[in-house]
Amino acid sequence: MRTENTATLNLMWGALILEELARLGVQHVCMAPGSRSTPLTLAAAKQTKLKRHLHFDERGLGFMALGLAKASSAPVAIITTSGTAVANLYPAIVEAWLTHVPLIVLSGDRPPELLGCGANQAIVQPAIFANYAQQVNLPTPDAHIAPQMLLTTLDEAVANQTRPVHINCMYREPLYPSELTATILDSESPYLKPLQTWLQQARPYTIYGKREQLSHPSEDAIMRFVHGKGVIIAGTLTPEQDPQQLIALSQKIGWPLLTDAQSQLRQHPAAIGNIDQLLQHPKARNLLQEADRVLVFGGRLLSKRLIAYLAEQNWHSYWQVLPQQDRLDPSHNAKHIWHANAAQFAQLNWYRSSSANWANTLITYNDDLHHLFVRNIDQGEFGEAQVIRAIANTRPLEQQLFIGNSLPVRLYDMYAPVSCCTATTYTNRGASGIDGLLATACGIAAHQGKPTSLIIGDLSQLHDLNSFAIARSLTSPLVIIILNNDGGNIFNLLPVPNEELRSDYYRLSHGLEFGYAAAMFNLPYNQVDNLADFQTCYNEALDFQGASVIEVTVSQHQASEQIAALNLWVKQS
């Protein structure tokens, strides 16, 4: 029988869920409006331990949660109503699963008797995320189900979790209590009597021990591993892994450190950051082919040339270091995968290689490319690579950088400048989609309030126009730099059979500008077509307490023609 008690118990379960998630380390909850999720929404509204973020579009909401989780290194909860609202989270959940980002989806759902019978807004929600989330299906709230069961279910699903969890929450009507009391979890409630101790504490009901993070080789194995010519590769690494320790490791062993755009070390002067270009430099490539052992930190490398190098080289020893058990080696050459924090592994008792400094000439080649890029990009024609290098050199210690997919992140990987300091860098390179990039950047910016720059292509921004609504709510600097080359011009770099096919089926020129979109959301907007204007607008935007848009207008072929010219110079070096 549906009574006021149903609404009260629904709300109590919602409050238990939100309270336990807060105790499990959740700091942020992202919410979209909807009726069936009312018990969760009202509980979140009363929960003082969580920072609330609201958005009307679940796709953008999911990506905002992804950004918050990346920036906070903590799980983030997402509340949605039933039906396609849940399905709209799928792209963000896929990205989070592939990159080990813990998102906790709390989806409101119809009770069992309203499923599969034509009831409104009712779909099969359990397992909707298939391979990309751990699934928990909660029953409808019932006074005969002990509240301890609810808490232990949450604890087992969420504790130590590094990937998405989907908690499906069925609720019967009525969903709205006649009044909202000051305290939902009232210790005087008979239903909560078994939780008296828990209510007086601040810890989870069940505490799970931390999983052992570090596996490491023996000293003898290390001695044998470093006995020869080797390279160290820094792939995707989070700031929490303290990638700077890899610089010290490289210097101790005497092997070069080759750095990916996502390593936090791409611009470090002691690293070989221009590895993508060096692998088409004849002398550098010949030298690198002498290596017979490799130590890879992280995975998901950007450079196809570096990926091919790892696949084609005849390695005597191939070690990879990952923070969790995973398979992130498309070459299938890795023979030992160690589960450890990068910094911890780098601080083991390493020995100097018997072939220390074998590749020191790479430093000269890397420096030569640095000077080439200064002459031909910084001092050359206005374009996308020039803007990206200018961003990377502007106030790096003051800000964080989110680099969009497709062409922007590749240009950064190929041509980022050498710098004494680097902004903390984020990407979405799990599934490498061009959706949700602005929303992710908004989440990153919202966590600490640190100035944030987003570099995004025009098609990516068209995908995520709704997230301008999230951006306008920010109170810290978010500079949205849209590189508008009128279409998907990364396809200029790919062997499409002819120009007509490229234009009609791949590039999809649109002729659109973003000024009216920015105005619709009341965001400051500038359009630039030269470096001086860009730098003026960019520095002003970094000081503006909120989001702003800089649209960089470039020709369709500027980047691809510049890349071709630089490739030719490098190959002839």
From Swiss-Prot:
Metabolic or biological pathway: Quinol/quinone metabolism; 1,4-dihydroxy-2-naphthoate biosynthesis; 1,4-dihydroxy-2-naphthoate from chorismate: step 2/7; Quinol/quinone metabolism; menaquinone biosynthesis
Enzyme Commission number(s): 2.2.1.9
Catalytic activity: isochorismate + 2-oxoglutarate + H(+) = 5-enolpyruvoyl-6-hydroxy-2-succinyl-cyclohex-3-ene-1-carboxylate + CO2
Cofactor: record remark: Binds 1 thiamine pyrophosphate per subunit.
Entry's Gene Ontology molecular function annotations: 2-succinyl-5-enolpyruvyl-6-hydroxy-3-cyclohexene-1-carboxylic-acid synthase activity; magnesium ion binding; manganese ion binding; thiamine pyrophosphate binding
Keywords assigned by UniProt, alphabetized: Magnesium, Manganese, Menaquinone biosynthesis, Metal-binding, Thiamine pyrophosphate, Transferase
CDD domains reported in the protein's UniProt record: TPP_PYR_MenD, TPP_SHCHC_synthase
InterPro entries to which the protein is assigned, alphabetical: DHS-like_NAD/FAD-binding_dom, MenaQ_synth_MenD, MenD_middle, THDP-binding, Thiamin_PyroP_enz_TPP-bd_dom, TPP_enzyme_TPP-bd
A Pfam match: TPP_enzyme_C
Keyword Transport: no
One GO term (biological process): menaquinone biosynthetic process
Keyword Methyltransferase appears in the UniProt entry: no
Cofactor needs: Mg(2+); Mn(2+); thiamine diphosphate
Family: Belongs to the TPP enzyme family. MenD subfamily.
Function comment: Catalyzes the thiamine diphosphate-dependent decarboxylation of 2-oxoglutarate and the subsequent addition of the resulting succinic semialdehyde-thiamine pyrophosphate anion to isochorismate to yield 2-succinyl-5-enolpyruvyl-6-hydroxy-3-cyclohexene-1-carboxylate (SEPHCHC).
Oligomer status and interactors: Homodimer.
Designated name of the protein: 2-succinyl-5-enolpyruvyl-6-hydroxy-3-cyclohexene-1-carboxylate synthase
Organism per entry: Shewanella oneidensis (strain ATCC 700550 / JCM 31522 / CIP 106686 / LMG 19005 / NCIMB 14063 / MR-1)
Gene: menD
